[in-house]
Amino acid sequence: SAFDLTVIPTFAIGCAEFFHPADEGWGPRPVPKVCGCPELAWHIAQSVIEDEFDLTIMNDMVVDHGLTVPLSLLFGQPQAWPCRVIPLAVNVVVYPSPSGRRCYQLGKAIRRAVESYDRDLNVQVWGTGGMSHQFQGPRDGLINSDFDSAFFDALLNDPEKLAEKPRIDYLREA
């Protein structure tokens, strides 16, 4: 993970010029550094903080598999990624994690921030941290495709209802 257990922010936004791949125990992944967009990241941070969200500002941040693997799946193995990225880390590692409602509201606040920005840029905001896998215990490697399909349908068709789903349901079902 990009964070160790000494500091785990609930929400953190990367505001740096670039982000190096994290060493997750086997050395950093052999992928390009991720180029950021500090001017837009700072605009988003200021906007969502004014919108009552407390973000941890990361001026130096490494990015883990939660960002570098999806980038690799989308773009292969280029010498440099074809887009700039603003990483947004969400604590899903230790209790207490934010509720679905809180994450949904933050997503809406980020959208307002991006829409209010006065420049036309090619930048992606990536939220990392999620329910896609558990590395230990009896559910290690389990994929619940029925839950996943229902989740993605609800994400598109009824995000308000999905935002009310209790955290424990994700732990049991995802």
Predicted regions and their residues:
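Short, solvent-exposed loop/turn segments at secondary-structure junctions
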Residues: 133-135
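A short, acidic, amphipathic alpha-helical segment used as a generic capping/interface helix at domain edges
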Residues: 110-115
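Flexible, D/E/H-enriched segments
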Residues: 5-105, 116-119, 137-174
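Beta-strand elements within well-structured catalytic alpha/beta cores of enzymes
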Residues: 1, 88, 121-129
